[in-house]
Amino acid sequence: MAQRYDELPHYGGMDGVGVPASMYGDPHAPRPIPPVHHLNHGPPLHATQHYGAHAPHPNVMPASMGSAVNDALKRDKDAIYGHPLFPLLALVFEKCELATCTPREPGVAGGDVCSSDSFNEDIAVFAKQVRAEKPLFSSNPELDNLMIQAIQVLRFHLLELEKVHELCDNFCHRYISCLKGKMPIDLVIDERDGSSKSDHEELSGSSTNLADHNPSSWRDHDDATSTHSAGTPGPSSGGHASQSGDNSSEQGDGLDNSVASPGTGDDDDPDKDKKRQKKRGIFPKVATNIMRAWLFQHLTHPYPSEEQKKQLAQDTGLTILQVNNWFINARRRIVQPMIDQSNRAGFLLDPSVSQGAAYSPEGQPMGSFVLDGQQHMGIRPAGLQSMPGDYVSQGGPMGMGMAQPSYTPPQMTPHPTQLRHGPPMHSYLPSHPHHPAMVMHGGPPTHPGMTMSAQSPTMLNSVDPNVGGQVMDIHAQ
């Protein structure tokens, strides 16, 4: 260590290093400029050239004076190197260097060599060793104070480096924990592999809908945004839609808790049972029967409220999320096929379960009637354009057909003027003179071939239901 300091260049003209000021001359006297030999802008300056012109006589330091300065510096360095505390100062300096380049893993040898605890141990060992050999301080108190302050400064550096290391380790630990929590890579890979294989096996059993692959959060949003839909039609009088709903209901027995996957839900081979149950939960028959009963009781609006979901969850022993996912899939797999088949068959909708406008496949209300005084849209929806006028559900004040579930429409007597297919499409336009709203003076429009049971009480009293077929647009002749 002392040899490294000996190699440092020695500079002349240093004040205040314990050497008498008389050796350096007057500190306010002009100093000569040392010769510069590495510049090529002119000849080297003469040693007698000095700063300023106010000094009448140049003050040149003799050679003996320079050697005296070097001797004084050497004595000071020797005093520092020979101080009893210098080995401790060098040790702390090396610890500061090691703190920036040594691995900090607990299992690595020498990882704690630069810690603050090791510094305290080193001080204790050093104090015991030095006291046994020689005292800790020298005869120069100024030098002793300098050594102690230097050791304290390096000690502060070591503590600050240790704080930085702790912050770095804490950040790395929290960052890795956050990544593990947000991205469970192993679980994601296993789930992806299992779902792809299972989907490939189940695709032959049922058709795939794009909406069935949405995460549960998207489906919750779809459930919340579709609550404004109008009522859905029930089973047709011919029983075809009811049979389709029963067959489709088997597809909703087993539903995925996180991602709704296509499939029939029926139990396959026993060797696939464990993998199937791991991928999606198979609900008990009792639970599915309870939820299916609620669904058929509320076909007009198959969207349970939050309180109803909680009650269903308590009755079935499932979670609210499972109940919510079951109804999302049931609306697609049970209700929607019933609507599609009913629209294709064109049967008369049962008023006990259909209380208004049809439920379109796009999830939008199909009703075309509005409140009195509002602008009448007049355009029949796409789902009802292919149906005859006799099959259009009865429209109430809200266009929802507020018929009671126990109500049965009376049989209409045949009439020669009864129109089986209703007026043409252009008569439903608001600007057409044959618009039903103009005939009824802004009230709910009637349709040829429909009874007047869903109209206002005054019309019920003034019109005989048995001659409902004669109530028609007088301009449609």
Swiss-Prot record:
Residues 110-193 form the MEIS N-terminal domain. Residues 71-191 are annotated as: Required for interaction with PBX1. The keyword Lyase does not apply. Residues 204-217, 239-251 have a biased composition (Polar residues). Residues 193-283 are annotated as: Disordered. SUPFAM superfamilies: Homeodomain-like. SMART domains: HOX (SM00389). Residues 276-338 bind DNA. The lineage of its organism: Eukaryota, Metazoa, Chordata, Craniata, Vertebrata. Residues 193-203 have a biased composition (Basic and acidic residues). Belongs to the TALE/MEIS homeobox family. This is Homeobox protein Meis2. It is found in: Nucleus; Cytoplasm, Perinuclear region. Involved in transcriptional regulation. Binds to HOX or PBX proteins to form dimers, or to a DNA-bound dimer of PBX and HOX proteins and thought to have a role in stabilization of the homeoprotein-DNA complex. Isoform Meis2B is required for the activity of a PDX1:PBX1b:MEIS2b complex in pancreatic acinar cells involved in the transcriptional activation of the ELA1 enhancer; the complex binds to the enhancer B element and cooperates with the transcription factor 1 complex (PTF1) bound to the enhancer A element; MEIS2 is not involved in complex DNA-binding. Residues 340-477 are annotated as: Transcriptional activation domain. GO terms for cellular component: nucleus; perinuclear region of cytoplasm. Induction: By retinoic acid. InterPro entries: HD, Homeodomain-like_sf, KN_HD, PKNOX/Meis_N, TALE_homeobox. Keywords: Activator, Cytoplasm, Developmental protein, DNA-binding, Homeobox, Nucleus, Transcription, Transcription regulation. The keyword Transmembrane helix does not apply. It holds the Pfam family Homeobox_KN. Residues 299-333 are annotated as: Interaction with DNA. One of its GO terms (molecular function) is RNA polymerase II cis-regulatory region sequence-specific DNA binding. One of its GO terms (biological process) is eye development. Displays spatially restricted expression patterns in the developing nervous system, limbs, face, and in various viscera. In adult, it is mainly expressed in the brain and female genital tract, with a different distribution of the alternative splice forms in these organs. Lower expression in lung and only basal level in heart, liver, kidney, spleen, and testis. Expressed in pancreatic islets (beta-cells only). Its main location: nucleus. Monomer and homodimer. Heterodimer with HOXB13. Isoform Meis2A interacts with TLX1. Isoform Meis2B interacts with HOXA13 and PBX1 isoform PBX1b. Isoform Meis2D interacts with SP1, SP3 and KLF4. Isoform Meis2D interacts with PBX1 isoform PBX1a; the interaction partially relieves MEIS2 autoinhibition. Isoform Meis2B is part of a PDX1:PBX1b:MEIS2b complex; Meis2B is recruited by PBX1b and can be replaced by isoform Meis2D in a small fraction of complexes. Can form trimeric complexes including HOXB8 and PBX2 or PBX3.
